Regions:
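The N-cap/first-turn positions of alpha helices
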Residues: 2-5, 29, 61
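Hydrophobic residues on short alpha-helical segments
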Residues: 6-13, 58, 65
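Short helix-boundary/capping micro-motifs
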Residues: 10-28
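Helix-turn-helix DNA-binding elements, focusing on the entry/boundary residues of the two helices
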Residues: 17-18, 36, 50
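Hydrophobic a/d positions of heptad-repeat amphipathic alpha-helices forming coiled-coil signaling/dimerization
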Residues: 25-26, 61, 68
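A short LG(V/I)-centered, amphipathic sequence patch enriched
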Residues: 40-57
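Alpha-helical linker/hinge and terminal dimerization helices associated
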Residues: 42-43, 64-84
Length: 84
């Protein structure tokens, strides 16, 4: 199961800073920036308001993160059940 998109968005929402989120995800800052920008283009809605280096969730971003966290929790429960 690959929930990379959800992990990236949730981590950026948690840290509010692209560089810190990228470090936590073990990817480069430019790679995360491009990924988030492309995701927002594909969704047709911004998930984050950018204020300098600070990233703040939009209303759509808040809804996205709410569902993404639920998906990540289900993934964890699934993995715990299957691989225990």
């Amino acid at each position: 199961m690959d929930l990379r998109e959800q992990k990236y968005v949730c981590t950026l929402a948690e840290y509010g800073n692209l560089t810190r989120a990228a470090e936590r995800l073990y990817i480069s800052q430019p790679a995360l920036s491009i990924y988030i920008t492309n995701l927002e283009k594909n969704l047709g809605v911004p998930l984050f308001d950018r204020n300098g280096k600070k990233f703040v969730l939009t209303y759509a971003g808040e809804r996205y993160v709410e569902k993404a966290r639920a998906m990540l929790q289900l993934e964890q429960e699934f993995n715990d059940e299957v691989y225990s």
